[in-house]
């Protein structure tokens, strides 16, 4: 039995039996993790794909590494852990369709299990507390800007971790990202979910949030302002230092404000 046959005849039925591929429980097959590291000369190394990624309520919860039925499940354990680490997932599985080996990256617990967990079981394992804002954020899809933008795995991790911290009422969140990783895109998607879910400091959904995008140069603030064009026009406000000096106050007639640090320096 080939690996493809193992997936179709042994693994897929087990996933369906546990309630996956129903309603909000998604099974992402051959999920692209990375396009491959860029090497000398501009060539890329081999792309990395996970056999399965399980998502529930819009959040990725686990990865599965599949091996063909005549191999031991242990052949996939190392890859299962590696993919879970890359995707920052707490739970991962290695399976040959006959046996299922469960690994918790958080506690280090590893064991053979009789079946895959149901979507609700996996959700409760990952999130021990009930949090309405976590689910509200997850319900808002990413804005793909008319199909011109595709999220990278590390961007999704950054966005998800940030929104989880917001849902947990964390007051300070710091993301450290290298040049070229798409920091503005990450900021856009975070703002998009906050805006669409009507999150605000009162956490009551009664009004839209106010979000400040700060840059150190006007050209960067202008670029960000243009990159946020998917928002309604009346939600975006470009603040110029000269306008603050002239009016003596910061405008508040919007939701997303763009300016430079110097705007707040005397």
Locate each region found by the language model.
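Phosphate/diphosphate-binding loops
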Residues: 95, 240-242
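Short, solvent-exposed loop/turn elements at domain surfaces
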Residues: 266
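ATP-dependent helicase/translocase motor core
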Residues: 1-62, 67-211, 215, 219-235, ...
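Conserved motor-coupling elements within RecA-like helicase/translocase cores
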Residues: 242-257
